[in-house]
Design a protein with these regions (language model features):
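NAD(P)H-binding glycine-rich loop region in Rossmannoid oxidoreductase-like domains
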Residues: 1-61, 71-75
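Conserved cofactor-binding/catalytic machinery of classical short-chain dehydrogenase/reductase
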Residues: 16, 50-53, 65, 87, ...
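SDR active-site strand-loop-helix element
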Residues: 33-34, 66-71, 101-103
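A short helix->loop->beta-strand "cap" motif at the edges of active sites that frequently abuts
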Residues: 60-65, 95-96
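Oxidoreductase cofactor-interface core, primarily capturing Rossmann-like NAD(P)-dependent enzymes
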Residues: 75-186
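Mid/C-terminal beta-alpha module of Rossmann-like enzyme folds, strongest
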Residues: 148-219, 227-260
């Protein structure tokens, strides 16, 4: 498909530096949108290796800017969030100037976060509510996220800095589940508080009732225990983008799924 559109495809593995030779030839901007959570144990180490190899390739081959999408939140509270942040540090240390976007949940048809919400609402008549369902987050739609990434090379203020992005709504995960139910034409699900459930049990629960692999679910659940909201909007201001509301994100995602 990409070749048919006149694009050149370079296949490689970011953990194998030799496979990246020539990947950045002729490029001005390179996007690093790689994560290794699905690989289970050791995903953080693989991410750092991949980031270093990619950054070194970009610098060696004359790439002028690297753009990376990481996560919002206090990176000291979760191995998942810490790995996202350390990946940015590796890219900045080893490569060209970095634009480091940080986002919470990205909502769009096909995204893991969206699918998890939809499956929880669609499959469970009653929902157990671990403490993390009361954590605040600031979701952003896939359309706005892609637009931030696309505009980055044309926004000089974003070079060499962190850019926190989010939609207009700050919600708890429980509130997002209720809004998903309403968007699907269902009543919000009754909730059964289970305050002492561990991240491991939460991940197992998600793995049983949603398509999310338990190996992916556990680091995600660990990250859900900390608030993921924009604390410094200044980096996003030069982009002049107005992300959609959470309800509009859901409407678009459900409509796109219905068309598939």
């Amino acid at each position: 498909m990409l070749e048919a559109a006149g694009l050149e495809v370079h296949s490689g593995d970011v953990t194998d530096a030799s496979s990246l030779r020539g990947a950045g030839s002729g490029m001005e901007v390179a996007y690093f949108l790689v994560h290794s959570m699905g690989g289970g144990v050791g995903f953080a180490e693989r991410e750092q290796l991949g980031a270093r190899n990619f950054a070194q390739m970009a610098r060696r081959e004359g790439v002028e800017r690297v753009v990376y999408l990481g996560g919002l939140g206090d990176e000291t509270t979760s191995k998942h969030l810490r790995s996202r942040h350390e990946t940015a540090l590796a890219l900045a240390a080893e490569g060209p100037p970095l634009t480091y976007f940080r986002a919470a949940m990205v909502v769009g048809a096909g995204s893991e976060s969206y699918r998890t919400l939809r499956y929880l609402v669609g499959r469970l008549p009653v929902m157990i509510t671990p403490a993390w369902l009361r954590t605040a987050t600031q979701p952003i739609g896939i359309d706005a996220t892609v637009e931030y990434l696309r505009r980055a090379p044309d926004v000089p203020e974003s070079e060499g800095r962190e850019v926190q992005i989010g939609g207009p709504d700050v919600l708890t995960y429980g509130e997002m589940l209720d809004r998903m139910a309403l968007a699907m034409g269902k009543r919000p699900r009754p909730k059964l508080p289970v305050p002492l459930i561990t991240p491991w049990l939460s991940a197992l629960w998600l793995g049983l009732v949603t398509p999310v692999d338990t190996r992916v679910a556990r680091p995600l659940v660990e990250g859900l225990r900390t608030a993921t909201v924009v604390t410094d909007p200044s980096g996003a201001e030069p982009f002049e983008i107005s992300p959609a509301s959470f309800d509009e994100m859901l409407r678009r995602a459900l409509a796109e799924e219905a068309e598939q």
